[in-house]
């Protein structure tokens, strides 16, 4: 704090109690400095950023599907979950009526989506956008679980998540905070269902 820079006109900053976008409660996790929206994918801002991360070059890497297209498809109600991206072909006729979408561009987009139906487990885990899970941690989880099905079975909301947490912290380079975020993510029934839906696509 630079006390000498104070003028006397400073005011106390009140942290928001709710998200300015979706109005869900904004809470500050213990030990952190920032408040976070609890709205999840029900929050338009989180949905947009989450899907943008999902299709990014170092995640699913879907060519031709960037921030502009994601925002447009969300606004149209076509994409509300990651799995919806792989169902966007159902909207090809409606897409053809939009500005900037000719037959060739639609075919290229659908082809780019189709070839990414199978990716490495490491990329898949990273694409989920789990807090504190970057490429290195995603690689560790992929090596440990071996398959998406095994990972989902071990981290199901119906499983013993305390035991799953203990297994995670025993993995070299995964600490308690990261293990907490991983079990909290998969332990959320709504998020878990979205992942199961995604895998079926």
Regions found by a protein language model. Name each.
Residues 2-201:
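Accessory alpha-helical DNA-binding modules that contact the DNA backbone or grooves
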